C-alpha cells in the first residue's frame, strides 16, 4: 500500500520539530527527510520538494517563497507555516473553523497558508462577530496578547534556555513597539476589519501558551448588543468545531485568571466572553498553545484535511 509522502522543509526549527514529532509515529503518512548535511542544499531541497505529495514549509518568509519557486511538479501541494503568503489571494487561509465550508476549501486546496499564532486567537474571536453584524467593521479594535517565549522561534528559545541572564531577567517583554507587527495585516484581512487593529504583543518568561484579550465597549456597538449576544454568536459558530470551544458564561464569570499554559500540548482553542457587573464592558479572551493551534497543531490539522480526514475540523 502506498502512503502520502510529506516533506517538512525546515524540520529543525521550533515549528518543524513539533510537526515532525506529531507525524513521526503515524502509519498513514511517510516522512521524507534529508540528512543533516543536505538540509540547506538548495538542489537537494528542490528534489525533495518535487518528490513529495505534500510539502510543509517551516522557514523564514524569504526562504519559504524560494521553496515555492523550487516546485515544478504540479501535483505537489503545499502548507506554508511562514507569514509569506497569509494575505495572498491565491492561497487558502488555513483556519478551518473560521467560516462555514472553509474546511472543505482547505481539503481541496493546492496551496494552504498556516495562520499566525496571534491571528488565530484574534480572528477566532472577531470574525464571527463581524460577520453577524454584532461588531461594526470600523470598530477600533485593540488586542493584547502574551505568548511563551517559544513564539520568538529558535533564537528566543536559545536565549531563554541557554543561560542568557539578560533574557531570563525580564518576566515580561512587550515588543512590537513601532505598532508594525507583521500579524496586523493578516488579522485585519481575515477578521474583516475596516481599519488596522491596535496590537500589543508580549513574551512571558515561560515556554509556551498564549492568552489574548480584546476589550469591547458595548456602547459603541449596535443597539441591543449585549455580552450575552456576543457569547451566543460565538457558541453557535463553533458548536460543531472539534478544536474550538467557547466557555459557558457562568464559567467565564467565575474565572479569576486566564492560564496561558492551560491548553499546552493540544490543538485546542478556548474562547471566552467576560462581562463586567453593569454590562457595559466585555473582555473577549482566547487561550491556546502557540506551538499547537498556533503553529504545528494547525499545520497537522490542515494536512489531515488535505489527506481527506473529515474528523480533522
Swiss-Prot record:
Presence of keyword Lyase: no
Keyword match Amino-acid biosynthesis: yes
Tree of life domain: Bacteria
Similarity field: Belongs to the NAGSA dehydrogenase family. Type 2 subfamily.
Reactions that this protein is recorded to catalyse: N-acetyl-L-glutamate 5-semialdehyde + phosphate + NADP(+) = N-acetyl-L-glutamyl 5-phosphate + NADPH + H(+)
Protein location: Cytoplasm
Pathway assigned to this chain's UniProt record: Amino-acid biosynthesis; L-arginine biosynthesis; N(2)-acetyl-L-ornithine from L-glutamate: step 3/4
GO molecular function: N-acetyl-gamma-glutamyl-phosphate reductase activity; NAD binding
InterPro entries recorded: AGPR_type-2, NAD(P)-bd_dom_sf, NAGSA_dehydrogenase, Semialdehyde_DH_NAD-bd
Cellular component terms per the entry's GO annotation: cytoplasm
Cross-referenced SUPFAM superfamilies: Glyceraldehyde-3-phosphate dehydrogenase-like, C-terminal domain, NAD(P)-binding Rossmann-fold domains
Entry-linked HAMAP family: ArgC_type2
GO biological process, one term: L-arginine biosynthetic process
Function: Catalyzes the NADPH-dependent reduction of N-acetyl-5-glutamyl phosphate to yield N-acetyl-L-glutamate 5-semialdehyde.
EC number: 1.2.1.38
Name of the featured protein: N-acetyl-gamma-glutamyl-phosphate reductase
This protein's UniProt keywords: Amino-acid biosynthesis, Arginine biosynthesis, Cytoplasm, NADP, Oxidoreductase
Pfam family, one: Semialdhyde_dh
Gene: argC
Catalytic residues (positions): 117
Amino acid at each position: 500500500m502506498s502512503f502520502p509522502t510529506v516533506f517538512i522543509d525546515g524540520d529543525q526549527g521550533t515549528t518543524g520539530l513539533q510537526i515532525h514529532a506529531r507525524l513521526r509515529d503515524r502509519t498513514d503518512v511517510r516522512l521524507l527527510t534529508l540528512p543533516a548535511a543536505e538540509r540547506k542544499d538548495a538542489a537537494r531541497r528542490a528534489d525533495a520538494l518535487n518528490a513529495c505529495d505534500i510539502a510543509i514549509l517551516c522557514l523564514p518568509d524569504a526562504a519559504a517563497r524560494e521553496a515555492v519557486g523550487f516546485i515544478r511538479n504540479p501535483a505537489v501541494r503545499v502548507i506554508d507555516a511562514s507569514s509569506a503568503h497569509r494575505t495572498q489571494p491565491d492561497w487558502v487561509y488555513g483556519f478551518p473553523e473560521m467560516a462555514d465550508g472553509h474546511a472543505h476549501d482547505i481539503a481541496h486546496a493546492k496551496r494552504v497558508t498556516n495562520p499566525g499564532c496571534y491571528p488565530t486567537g484574534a480572528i477566532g474571536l472577531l470574525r464571527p462577530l463581524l460577520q453577524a453584524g454584532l461588531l461594526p467593521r470600523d470598530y477600533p479594535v485593540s488586542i493584547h496578547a502574551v505568548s511563551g517565549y517559544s513564539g520568538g522561534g529558535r533564537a528566543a528559545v536559545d536565549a531563554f534556555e541557554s543561560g542568557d541572564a539578560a533574557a531570563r531577567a525580564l518576566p515580561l517583554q512587550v515588543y512590537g513597539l513601532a505598532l508594525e507587527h507583521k500579524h496586523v495585516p493578516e488579522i485585519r484581512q481575515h477578521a474583516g476589519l475596516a481599519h488596522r487593529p491596535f496590537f500589543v504583543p508580549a513574551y512571558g518568561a515561560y515556554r509556551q501558551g498564549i492568552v489574548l484579550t480584546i476589550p469591547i465597549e458595548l456602547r459603541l456597538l449596535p443597539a441591543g448588543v449585549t455580552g450575552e449576544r456576543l457569547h451566543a454568536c460565538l457558541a453557535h459558530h463553533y458548536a460543531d468545531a472539534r478544536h474550538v470551544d467557547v466557555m459557558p458564561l457562568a464559567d467565564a464569570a467565575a474565572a479569576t485568571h486566564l492560564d496561558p499554559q492551560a491548553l499546552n500540548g493540544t490543538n485546542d482553542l478556548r474562547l471566552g466572553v467576560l462581562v463586567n457587573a453593569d454590562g457595559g464592558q466585555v473582555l473577549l479572551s482566547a487561550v491556546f498553545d502557540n506551538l499547537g493551534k498556533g503553529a504545528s497543531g494547525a499545520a497537522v490539522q490542515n494536512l489531515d484535511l488535505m489527506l481527506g480526514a473529515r474528523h480533522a475540523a
